[in-house]
Amino acid sequence: MDTSQLKRIPLFADASDADLAKVAVFAQSKEVPEGETAVTEGGFSRELLAIEDGTAEVSRDGEHIADLGPGDVFGEAGMLDDQMRSATVIATSRLKLISLGHFEVQRLKKDAPGIYSRIEELVEQRR
């Protein structure tokens, strides 16, 4: 993955080029067609996902709670706290996502601590 793709995501925007290069090595691109479920409430949280392009709807217990778009991140809480997913995210248009798996996020603690700290801050803000 190219580091310029990561820089467009606010979570990574202020990261150093060196840290972004470390993330880019193991970041994966993923697509979710319109109408499909990206993550399911109650499911295992195995990846952090950032929206590169497209839109999605977030619901909890069947109730709409938020809309997401380019630059938004989801799945981060379960990555750090080893919790089940707290909401369902459904693509309202084709989603182009950047995915970081659980192992890769944990690896950021050592390889890119500044980015890992930003993820921790995001989790705290959403509690």
Where are the regions a protein language model picked out?
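A small-molecule sensor/coupling module
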Residues: 2, 18-22, 84-85, 102-127
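Regulatory nucleotide-sensing modules
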Residues: 3, 7-61, 68-70
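Helix-loop-beta junctions that constitute the ligand-sensing/allosteric loops
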Residues: 28, 82-88, 94-97
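Short beta-strand His + acidic residue motifs that chelate non-heme Fe in jelly-roll/DSBH
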Residues: 58-59, 76-77, 87-91, 99, ...
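A short hydrophobic beta-strand segment most commonly corresponding to one strand
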Residues: 5, 94-105
